[in-house]
Amino acid sequence: MLRRQARERREYLYRKAQELQETQLQQKRQIIKQALAQGKPLPKELAEDEQLQKDFRYDQSMADNEDEAGVDDEYSASSGIVEARVIVTTSRDPSSRLAQFAKEIKLLFPNAVRLNRGNYVMADLVSACKKSGTTDLIVLHEHRGVPTSLTVSHFPYGPTAFFSLHNVVLRHDILNRGNQSEVNPHLIFDNFTTPLGNRVVTILKNLFPPGPKKDSSRVITFANRGDFISVRQHVYVRTKDGVEMAEVGPRFEMRLFELRLGTLENKDADVEWQLRRFVRTANRKDYL
């Protein structure tokens, strides 16, 4: 069993590396094509790549629209078909506030189950999730009673996204909050404009059940503002004068700081993207 899992992981990572290499080559060809069409000089690294320019003449794969990046191959077999089965857990010995936050996160995602961490080792927890058919694992961490991070790991092969949490407000701290609805919500993703942003959208939307939600009065919004993703949950009621909305909670912002290709217990997984604060433009550049 372990040998088969290791072999499947190696095959998957090799296929992923081939797809990423082809994607990078396709992006370089697209830059050359745009430079030729607009009469602009090539970037230095492409101008010095003689083999790339030589192959460009014989390239027949150029299209007017760019191909999909292929990095979402993890979701291709299940996206829009299989309902997500999400487990929400915390770090060991959670405070009462983190435990309450985990309950509210569990209510945020339909088909989610909250699991008391206990003495589970991460490797055993991931193994149990895979055997039970769980599609995603969400792990919450804290510092002195304040939730600080949220990790989403997709099974069986990844990816794993690490988010920092900011300005967390629980439901009981929101004045005039609406009643918690557990129907499948409408999803709003706003201002995700880059390939990395689309990658994050794919990770988040696959935590929710697919299909239409015509009769649902529940809306969950993920709004990107300067790489901080504001998460809000509302319920609405149609009236003769229009629509009345009430915030349900919880309310928080999260920021992506790392994206790995493997699952959570795999410390040697390739890092697909990482926020590097020591770069001068790190705080001035929008990545999502």
Swiss-Prot record:
GO cellular component, one term: small-subunit processome
Entries under Gene3D superfamilies matching the protein: Probable brix-domain ribosomal biogenesis protein
Cellular compartments annotated: Nucleus, Nucleolus
Gene Ontology MF, one: single-stranded telomeric DNA binding
Pfam families: Brix (PF04427)
Keyword hit for Nucleus: yes
Residue span, Brix domain: 84-265
Keywords recorded for this protein, A-Z: Nucleus, Ribonucleoprotein, Ribosome biogenesis, rRNA processing
Record bears the keyword Ribonucleoprotein: yes
GO biological process terms, semicolon-separated: ribosomal small subunit biogenesis; rRNA processing
Subunit annotation: Component of a heterotrimeric complex containing IMP3, IMP4 and MPP10.
Function: Component of the U3 small nucleolar ribonucleoprotein. Required for the early cleavages at sites A0, A1 and A2 during 18S ribosomal pre-RNA processing.
PANTHER family for the chain: U3 SMALL NUCLEOLAR RIBONUCLEOPROTEIN PROTEIN IMP4
Protein name as catalogued: U3 small nucleolar ribonucleoprotein protein IMP4
Gene giving rise to this polypeptide: IMP4
